[in-house]
Amino acid sequence: MMLIGEALIGEAPELAHVDLMIGDKEGPVGQAFATGMTQLSAGHTPVLSVIRPNLPTKPSTLIVPKVTVKGMDQASQIFGPAQAAVSKAVADAVEEGLIPKEKAEDLVIIASVFIHPQAVDYNRIYRYNYGATKLALKRALDGFPDIDTVLHEKDRAAHAVMGFKISKLWDAPYLQVALDNPNLPVILNIIKQLPKSDHLILEAGTPLIKRYGVDVISKIREVRPDAFIVADLKTLDTGNLEARMVADATADAIVVSALAPIATLNKVIEEAHKTGIYAVMDTLNTPDPVAVLEQLDVLPDVVELHRAIDIEGTAHAWGSIEGIKALAVKRSSKVLVAVAGGVRVDTISDALGAGADILVVGRAITNSKDVRQAADRFIEGLNKPEIDQFRIMTDF
């Protein structure tokens, strides 16, 4: 048996982060326990957990400092409140029945403990590490989190240290604002006026990228670190190279033209997936998007049904949505459909009713006298609440 648990509790600088393994003495955890006691590392010396001198806790527990111990003050925090907290938490887990008493001699625990170098309050160090150890033990023994929880939470999560989250398109529908004006100061001012929404995508338009190159993505990223940013290159050749350029520029998606050779389309999609970004196929001037898709090795993540600005007086091309989605089901793929060109507030329900997942809007927002109000009207038309808007956040 080898079970793994993790918990973070408290407030800086004394917050506690405990990772632990619990398992049989005769198994891999027991082997790691023995190795830890005999192969010491300067600054990370494992400590046998004792409730007080001459009274080790049961199951036997090894405490491993995560942060390099550089002086006696830090050593005292490990040997003092942290050791006492972990030892007491393990013993209490047995007393409370979390760990079966009859298993106390058969199991061992390895607990990696984080003590911030700026921590000073012994009381907080003890209480936070006690709580984190108990919670990590419970999670390990309960198998928390299960895979369904992981899949549910993975795109909602923002890592506390990183400070921002990488957005993914998993909660359609979305509003995509096309930033086509080739004037960067104007574009950055527009972005600052846009509302913050989980259902807002930013598109670095083709004219903007032609003027400033893909490095314009980093300028947009400075204003909106969390944004999902699409780089509309309308790639026609050198697909893998351009996909890599876009990924290196920190964009989240690259747009390739459906008019490109099939080999180029395949290379864009392959390289996009290698680098962890989305591949978008733009169907501008493509009479039969489904026929193009049927020739691809792997389907793109998004198909954009695009009516050009120069022909916006003509009818929309939303009729292809059903065929695209049917092909995606047949190929066991997930494909989002975006519609662009002439999308207005009064046509939102028509587009969504036809199966659109992303509404691409440009001048109706970017040329508006009140950018925020214009964007808000489209977002309200999506009729989609913010992710976790009504959720009361707990310990994870």
Curated annotation (Swiss-Prot):
Which region ranges are annotated with the description 3-hexulose-6-phosphate synthase?
Answer: 162-396
- Family according to the record: In the N-terminal section; belongs to the formaldehyde-activating enzyme family. In the C-terminal section; belongs to the HPS/KGPDC family. HPS subfamily.
Q: What class of enzyme is it?
A: lyase
Recorded name of the encoding gene = fae-hps
Give the GO terms filed under biological process for this record.
'de novo' pyrimidine nucleobase biosynthetic process; carbohydrate biosynthetic process; L-ascorbic acid catabolic process
Annotated substrate binding lies at D19, L48, K66, T68, Q83
**InterPro entries to which the protein is assigned, alphabetical:** Aldolase_TIM (IPR013785), Fae/Hps (IPR020868), HCHO-activating_enzyme (IPR014826), HCHO-activating_enzyme_sf (IPR037075), HPS/KGPDC (IPR041710), OMPdeCOase_dom (IPR001754), Ribosomal_Su5_D2-typ_SF (IPR020568), RibuloseP-bd_barrel (IPR011060)
Q: Could you tell me what this protein does?
A: Catalyzes the condensation of formaldehyde with tetrahydromethanopterin (H(4)MPT) to 5,10-methylenetetrahydromethanopterin. Catalyzes the reversible formation of ribulose-5-phosphate and formaldehyde from 3-hexulose-6-phosphate.
The protein's name = Bifunctional enzyme Fae/Hps
Q: Where is this region: Formaldehyde-activating enzyme?
A: 1-161
Q: In which pathway does it act?
A: Carbohydrate biosynthesis; D-ribose 5-phosphate biosynthesis
* Taxonomic superkingdom: Archaea
PANTHER family per UniProt: 3-KETO-L-GULONATE-6-PHOSPHATE DECARBOXYLASE SGBH-RELATED
